[in-house]
């Protein structure tokens, strides 16, 4: 149940409703009782038929008769044409009726909406529901079209004849303005047997299927005055108006009875009784035969005797007799039906749940019809708390049912059964009976209030600084542990530790990125508490690691995991551990399955074990400041085990909010510029956790040294109601130069921007959110916390008796110079990776120059591990010294060039000047390993040492390694194309377009963008698995087992990330790869040219790897460190530039998967095939559920099961009406079909791409983008993307980007070409477009306090957006053509006389109102006027518009 339509605004599917005729559901400012469910199109048809209902309606039914139906419409009604949406809805209504799902003992009443079309259906219980569905609704759309009502914004159809009761009335009404007031009024009229009057009407004859015979009114025409009105409503003259005719006061003979229904008069009642009118009047002592005094529900005698007493008695347990409200009920009819007065009915319900009196009654509420205890209320399918949670048992008498099923975390429960922590949920506004709330509020029934619960002050106010141990991986903004200002903190947290699949603690990416070095330094901190934080967002949510926490806390594994963690903390003499699991029980984290609801209790049990194993250490956990995620934590019980909670009161908002209507109050799009550290929301979060039972002195509150950034939708609009660009997975904010993550920018980077005043547009403190706001480069917006704001927050939190504060993170605060002993951060990071102490000073370090070829590490190479040889020959210091010579002496002289760097290194090692390791082997004389004696022979004293041999030979492996890939992805493509590509790719390219795009796409500038995207992505997908296999087979790493495999993967990621950056960079003219991305004559040729791009990028990578830049030196250091590329006891690296058959086969598979996985869906898109993925809404067990949209054979050949959801890959073939372009007289219905070429996919063609991969990739892209289409192309520099592509997983988000939607959304787009642009992005899953008839809009501000509310104007736009609404207006004056609530949009012709009309389209209104709001919104109001040119029957005309 929902309390207003705003809660359903983002739903794009068909919606079916149940609500009272008398509930003004269009009023968004008051509460309602709206029951709703969605349909993906075929849902009613796939439910089991109610054979009992079907049998009951057909048994003893009279023969069908011919009936006269009226189809009418209102030409002047505002709104858009209902025809297209009505087709969708009537098909589903037919399924509902034909399967016996309607009512049989009362009228069938149903409300529905699709797009801006609202529909109401009424079928009296004397009419056969199935017959209405089969015979009437099946032809409704054609009938409307033939009645010239196809463009009407309000259409109705009825069978409603004078003299018949409401039991024999059928009506359907559709309006195109998105509202239900006129729909409710129509159904209310039909329920009273009052027919609608149409301005334009057409009568048609059709079959009328009956359950009971029609009343033959002519038979009684001479007996009953023909002008006497039948009953159509309950009469009432006072609050006790309902008469109780002849209520039996004592036992005596009672009569048989009949009940009054709408439309009855005494003659029809007598007919129901089967007696004459005279007898009927006699039995009931009726002297005045005026039917207007009859009351619906009232009983009359059909025989002699006393009218029975129908008033109920209490149930045996003392509970009152109950009644469930129906859509067409009111108090008068209920009272009359049960021999009660309205006053009695009111008195019986003073304590009934949600009773707010008779006006209105709410559908499905359970009320009392007698004295007695109030009943339990009806359950609500979506209730989370309170007495209406499904399955709630009736408690003992005297129990306050408001306290049943309290919310997790002691959160507030509102009257709708929803849990929350804001004032919307937490203020009790009850109006009397339990479960009520003041109009326009949600009320509160349990755990009300938002106050922060303060405990005693903490014994120590904690000052926690997080240190990102991985910060040396960034291209800049480094901090060594030694540079942390320890005086500012009581605790330093090292982020992050990780766990292996066997629950061993690891420092991830340790040696390769310097994290291990920083961790070792972290352990040496004295005077400050040292805590290792294990987990974090990435570890908790990465597809490869998310199960470690989930499985680790289970009973089978928790002791092992806890023991390993405890041993690690004790072995490293740390002061404690923090567990950062994000988040137990989470159901909606993109890319991974929903978690178990048992996670929380398992986590608690794990913490108990861990605490027992570390009784003298600090144990803490991280917890989210979000109710949605925190409710998965048994946080009160956890607080009793842990020392305190790191409370993440940041990231309250971010790019991920886009398209999420629940993420931001007052922002239905979710894309408003909001602070991620808003003080009001933070205080609400503090209330939540302290109300949940965590003492405030155990809550360590988060502050940040970074900001959340957005790309503003409009320059100059930077307030909290202004919006940003991009979808949930596509931030368009400028990345920081060091953090390199769009939407996230370090304080150090912010301060650097502020230092350049030319970039700064606005810089201020927003008082309401207590946040620094920076607007720069015109459209870049950042919410952040300066030191001043952080200090003020810290004081506030201390005053609230919080346990302290925690700052993420120390290394984001400022730019640090390299530690004083290092000449640069490049030198420092290289030393760290090499395990060389960067703080040792001197020209030559270590003993490498004094070692000789007689050393055991040289002589016994085949019997000593690689890492030991590297260490004993002091190669790390040798490399460090060589780099020092380059950066301090040679680079300033030679410049940053590839030959210069190689020359410098070779000179340092006295290895000759002819080496050029940046050239493809065998060129450059860097492809052959040399013996130690060769190096020792240079120089007078052999001071190169054997270390030079290890380093040089490592270079040759790199050279050959890179050339190995070149031979596969370059030489075999570039030289004669007679290898892999020639036979595998190029031969298939000739058939590629013919297979997947029989009509080839026209040449487009878009081809170049696609080619460049594939250049980086494809290189990653080809090279990553290749490098991972090569590095994993190195003797140095193979000997390390699982740890070695992890190192190989880390090195691969570093190499590939570097290669991708080179592939898309501008390189010097001397670079060997001179390929340029250019469009070719055909799409297939254009895409095929990327193969040359990959090979050239590989050659360029080798060239730049030896150019002496900071990034190249860092990668070289990673590659050669610890002896990865030398021979040892495990053997020598088997790398040469000749290519084996097995390697060719592997790379063939890599290339095929990378190329065709990207190119096939892209070709479908640009060729206009418009292939897309249907989300059926059904589990995988469903059998062909979409027969309305696809044939059974298509469903069987295009489906895939993913996460137990059934999906289909299809496309809209041909024209929407099922006809060919010649439009034959008879057309066959068209269905979605398999896109061209899908049937040719196999394990031996097109790279082995599968149907499942195409579907899964598209769905992953859709989900990662916040369940929205239009997500960005995958970023090969993204860690998750890199990991996926390294595993040849092309289903990573952003690689395959076919749109995803339900069948009915796509069908609406396909079948309404006037409202859908088939060339638009996302077709046919894009929303229907509005109509544009005007141009040249001008604007003038008219906003005052009396202007319409912005919220009403936004609702007006929502109601007409994407519709075919078109208004034709004459010149006779101003006309309001669209309105909602306080907001009206009107037009008036300017300066044209005569018989002239002009047109205004729905999109014109949307465009104008959107711009007016952005320009003139003031204190929630907007008013404006202006001019435009609109098309009309006399050409383009000047029209004045007004928003008032």
From Swiss-Prot:
Q: Which reaction is recorded as catalysed by this protein?
A: Random endo-hydrolysis of N-acetyl-beta-D-glucosaminide (1->4)-beta-linkages in chitin and chitodextrins
Q: Where is the GH18 domain?
A: 461-831
Disulfide bonds listed in the record: 385-413, 407-419, 412-426, 444-448
Give the Enzyme Commission number: 3.2.1.14
Q: Name one GO biological process term.
A: polysaccharide catabolic process
Return the broad EC class: hydrolase
Gene3D superfamilies referenced in this protein's UniProt entry, alphabetically: 3.10.50.10, Endochitinase-like (3.30.60.10), Glycosidases (3.20.20.80), LysM domain (3.10.350.10)
Q: What exactly does this protein do?
A: Probable chitinase involved in the degradation of chitin, a component of the cell walls of fungi and exoskeletal elements of some animals (including worms and arthropods). Might be involved in manipulation of host defenses for successful infection.
Q: What is this protein called?
A: Probable chitinase LysM18
Encoding gene (name): LysM18
């Amino acid at each position: 149940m929902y309390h207003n339509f705003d809660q359903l605004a983002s739903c794009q599917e068909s919606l079916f409703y149940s609500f009272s005729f008398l509930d003004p559901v269009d009023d968004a400012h008051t509460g309602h009782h709206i029951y709703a469910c969605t349909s993906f199109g075929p849902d009613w048809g796939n439910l089991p038929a109610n054979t009992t209902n079907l049998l009951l309606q057909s048994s003893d039914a009279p023969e069908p008769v011919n009936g006269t139906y009226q189809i009418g419409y209102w030409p002047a009604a505002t709104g858009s044409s209902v025809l297209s949406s009505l087709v969708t809805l009537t098909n589903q209504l037919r399924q509902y009726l034909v399967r016996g799902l309607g009512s049989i003992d009362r009228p069938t009443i149903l409300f529905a909406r699709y797009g801006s079309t609202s529909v109401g259906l009424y079928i009296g219980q004397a009419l056969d529901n199935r017959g209405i569905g089969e015979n009437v609704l099946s032809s409704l759309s054609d009938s409307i079209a033939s009645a010239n009502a196809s463009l009407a914004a309000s259409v109705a159809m009825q069978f409603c004849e004078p003299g018949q009761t409401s039991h024999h009335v059928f009506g359907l009404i559709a309006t195109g303005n998105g509202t239900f007031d006129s729909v409710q009024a129509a159904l209310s009229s039909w329920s009273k047997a009052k027919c609608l009057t149409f301005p334009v009407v057409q009568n048609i004859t059709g079959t009328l299927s009956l359950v009971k015979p029609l009343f033959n009114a002519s038979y009684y025409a001479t007996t009953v005055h023909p002008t006497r009105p039948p009953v159509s409503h309950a009469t009432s003259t006072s609050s006790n108006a309902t008469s109780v005719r002849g209520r039996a006061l004592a036992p005596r003979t009672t009569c048989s009875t009949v009940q009054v229904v709408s439309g009855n008069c005494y003659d029809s009642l007598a007919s129901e009784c089967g007696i004459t009118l005279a007898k009927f009047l006699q039995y009931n002592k009726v002297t005045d035969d005026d039917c207007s005094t009859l009351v619906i529900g009232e009983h009359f005698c059909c025989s002699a005797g006393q009218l029975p007493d129908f008033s109920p008695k209490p149930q045996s347990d003392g509970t009152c007799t109950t009644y469930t409200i129906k859509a067409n009920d009111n108090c008068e009819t209920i009272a009359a039906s049960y021999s009660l007065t309205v006053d009695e009915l009111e008195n019986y319900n003073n304590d009934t749940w949600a009773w707010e009196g008779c006006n209105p009654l709410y559908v499905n509420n359970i009320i009392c019809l007698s004295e007695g205890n109030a009943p339990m209320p009806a359950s609500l399918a979506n209730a989370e708390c309170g007495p209406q949670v499904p399955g709630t048992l009736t408690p003992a008498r005297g129990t306050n049912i408001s306290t049943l099923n309290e919310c997790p975390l002691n959160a507030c429960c509102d009257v709708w059964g929803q849990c929350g922590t804001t004032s919307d949920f937490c203020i009790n506004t009850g109006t009397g009976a339990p479960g009520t709330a003041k109009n326009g509020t949600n009320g509160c029934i349990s755990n009300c209030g938002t106050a922060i619960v303060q405990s005693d002050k903490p014994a120590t106010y904690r000052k926690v600084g997080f240190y990102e141990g991985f910060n040396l991986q960034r291209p800049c903004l480094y901090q060594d542990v030694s540079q942390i200002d320890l005086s500012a903190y009581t605790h330093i947290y090292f982020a992050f530790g990780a766990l292996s699949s066997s629950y061993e603690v690891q420092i991830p990416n340790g040696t390769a990125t310097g994290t291990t070095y920083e961790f070792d330094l972290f352990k040496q901190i004295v005077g400050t508490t040292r805590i290792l934080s294990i987990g974090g967002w990435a570890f908790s949510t990465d597809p490869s690691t998310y199960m470690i926490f989930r499985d680790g806390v289970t009973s089978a594994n928790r002791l092992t995991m806890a023991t390993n963690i405890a041993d690690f903390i004790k072995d490293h003499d740390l002061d404690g551990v923090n567990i950062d699991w994000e988040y137990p029980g989470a159901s909606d984290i993109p890319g991974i399955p929903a978690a178990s609801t048992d996670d929380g209790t398992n986590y608690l049990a794990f913490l108990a074990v861990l605490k027992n194993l570390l009784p003298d250490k600090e144990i803490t956990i991280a917890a989210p400041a979000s109710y949605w995620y925190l409710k998965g934590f048994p946080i009160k019980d956890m607080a009793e085990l842990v020392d305190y909670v790191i409370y993440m009161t940041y990231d309250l908002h971010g790019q991920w909010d886009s398209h999420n209507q629940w993420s931001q109050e007052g922002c239905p799009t979710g894309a408003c510029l909001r602070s991620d550290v808003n003080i009001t929301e933070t205080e609400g979060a503090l209330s939540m956790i302290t109300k949940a039972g965590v003492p405030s002195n155990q809550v360590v509150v988060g502050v940040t040294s970074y900001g959340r950034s957005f790309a503003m939708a409009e320059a100059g609009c930077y307030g909290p109601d202004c919006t940003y660009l991009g979808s949930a997975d596509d931030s368009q904010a400028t990345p920081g130069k060091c953090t390199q993550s769009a939407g996230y920018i370090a304080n150090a980077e912010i301060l650097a921007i502020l230092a350049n005043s030319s970039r700064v547009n606005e810089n201020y403190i927003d008082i309401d959110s207590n946040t620094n706001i920076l607007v720069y480069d015109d459209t870049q917006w950042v919410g952040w916390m300066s030191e001043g704001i952080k200090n003020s927050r810290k004081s506030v939190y201390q005053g609230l008796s919080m346990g302290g504060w925690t700052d993420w993170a120390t290394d984001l605060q400022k730019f640090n110079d390299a530690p004083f002993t290092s000449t640069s951060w490049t030198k420092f990071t290289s030393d760290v990776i090499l395990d060389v102490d960067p703080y040792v000073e001197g020209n030559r370090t270590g003993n490498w120059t004094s070692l000789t070829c007689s050393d055991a590490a040289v002589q016994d190479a085949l019997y000593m591990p690689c890492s030991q040889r590297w260490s004993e020959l002091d190669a790390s210091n040798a490399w460090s010294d060589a780099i020092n010579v380059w950066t301090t002496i040679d680079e300033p002289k030679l410049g940053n060039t590839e030959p210069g760097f190689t020359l410098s290194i070779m000179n340092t090692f006295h290895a000759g000047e002819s080496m050029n390791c940046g050239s493809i082997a065998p060129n450059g004389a860097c492809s052959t390993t040399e013996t130690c004696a060769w190096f020792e022979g240079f120089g007078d004293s052999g001071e190169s040492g054997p270390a030079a041999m290890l380093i040089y030979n490592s270079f040759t492996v790199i050279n050959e390694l890179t050339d190995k890939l070149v031979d596969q992805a370059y030489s075999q493509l570039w030289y004669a194309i007679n290898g892999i590509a020639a036979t595998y790719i190029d031969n298939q390219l000739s058939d590629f377009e013919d297979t997947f795009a029989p009509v080839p796409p026209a040449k487009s500038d878009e081809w170049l963008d696609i080619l460049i995207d594939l250049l980086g992505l494809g290189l990653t997908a080809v090279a990553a698995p290749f490098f991972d296999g090569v590095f994993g087979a190195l003797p140095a790493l193979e000997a390390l087992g699982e740890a070695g495999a992890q190192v190989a993967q880390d090195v691969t990621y570093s190499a590939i990330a570097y290669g991708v950056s080179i592939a898309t960079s501008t390189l010097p003219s001397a670079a060997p790869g001179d390929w340029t991305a250019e469009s070719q004559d055909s799409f297939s040729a254009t895409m095929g040219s990327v193969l040359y791009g990959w090979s050239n990028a590989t050659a360029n990578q080798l060239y730049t790897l030896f150019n002496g830049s900071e990034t190249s030196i860092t990668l070289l250091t990673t590659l050669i460190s610890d002896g990865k590329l030398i021979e040892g006891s495990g053997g020598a690296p088997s790398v040469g530039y000749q290519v084996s058959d097995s390697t060719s086969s592997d790379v063939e598979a890599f290339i095929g998967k990378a190329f065709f996985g990207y190119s096939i869906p892209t070709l479908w898109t640009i060729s206009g095939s418009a292939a897309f993925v249907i989300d059926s809404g059904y589990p995988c067990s469903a059998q062909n559920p979409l027969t309305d949209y696809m044939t059974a054979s298509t469903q069987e050949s295009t489906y895939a099961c993913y996460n137990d959801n059934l999906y289909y890959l299809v496309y809209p073939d041909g024209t929407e009406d099922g006809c060919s372009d010649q439009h034959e007289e008879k057309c066959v219905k068209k269905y979605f079909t398999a896109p061209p070429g899908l049937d040719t996919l196999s394990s031996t063609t097109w790279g082995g791409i599968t149907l499942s991969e195409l579907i899964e990739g598209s769905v992953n892209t859709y989900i990662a983008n916040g369940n929205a289409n239009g997500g960005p192309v995958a970023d090969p520099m993204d860690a998750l993307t890199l990991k996926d592509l390294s595993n040849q997983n092309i289903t990573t988000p952003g690689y395959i980007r076919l749109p995803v939607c339900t069948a009915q959304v796509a069908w609406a787009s396909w079948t309404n070409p006037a409202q859908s642009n088939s060339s638009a992005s996302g077709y046919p899953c894009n929303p229907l477009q509005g109509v544009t008839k005007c141009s040249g809009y001008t604007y003038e501000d008219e906003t005052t306090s009396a202007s319409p509310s912005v919220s009403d104007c936004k609702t007006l736009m929502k109601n007409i957006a994407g519709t075919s609404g078109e208004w034709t207006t004459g010149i006779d004056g101003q006309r309001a053509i669209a309105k909602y609530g306080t907001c009206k949009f009107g037009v008036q012709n300017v300066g044209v006389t005569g018989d002239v009309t002009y047109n205004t389209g729905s999109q014109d209104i949307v465009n104008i109102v959107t711009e007016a709001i952005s320009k003139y919104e003031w204190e929630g109001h907007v008013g404006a006027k202006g001019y435009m040119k609109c098309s009309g029957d006399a050409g383009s005309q000047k029209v004045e518009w007004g928003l008032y």
